A protein has these predicted regions:
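Conserved alpha/beta core of the MobA/IspD/sugar-nucleotide pyrophosphorylase nucleotidyltransferase superfamily
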Residues: 55-130
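Conserved core of the sugar-phosphate nucleotidyltransferase
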Residues: 8-82
């Protein structure tokens, strides 16, 4: 799963064959962004802001078994009161986390550029700067 606001600058982080369920993340001493707390390589908590954590970068891989579970669990979560206000990744990481063992896969700060604003897009692609 890839978020639409990402520019991949290191194509090696994208793998053709991938057999674990994991999120790409950047090891951080401190972040104000969405991040993971990880124990023994497995994500145990997702939150906004943290110390000694892994900053989420918006790319995840899902093995076949977890992909099927995720399809059912997303539907179930979204049908519950308040479910439509949830982010999809909260389903396997928060609301149904007992169903999953989601690992973290390290990437580097310069592997991905996240484009959050029109100003950031214009800085990367001058054709938008009109």
């Amino acid at each position: 799963v890839f978020e639409a606001d990402l520019l991949i600058s290191n194509p090696k982080i994208i793998t053709k064959y991938h057999y674990t369920s994991d999120f790409l993340a950047i090891k951080k001493d401190r972040t104000d962004d969405w991040c993971f707390i990880v124990k023994d390589g497995v994500i145990v908590e997702e939150k906004v802001g943290g110390l000694d954590c892994w900053q989420m970068v918006g790319i995840s891989y899902w093995n076949e078994e977890d992909g099927h579970k995720l399809s059912d669990d997303i539907k179930m979560t979204y049908e519950q009161p308040g479910g439509k206000e949830r982010y999809w990744e909260q389903v396997p990481l928060v609301f149904c986390k007992k169903h999953y063992k989601v690992e973290v896969r390290e990437c580097q700060e310069n592997d991905i550029i996240e484009i959050d604003t029109f100003r950031e897009l214009k800085a990367i692609d001058k054709t938008y700067d009109v």
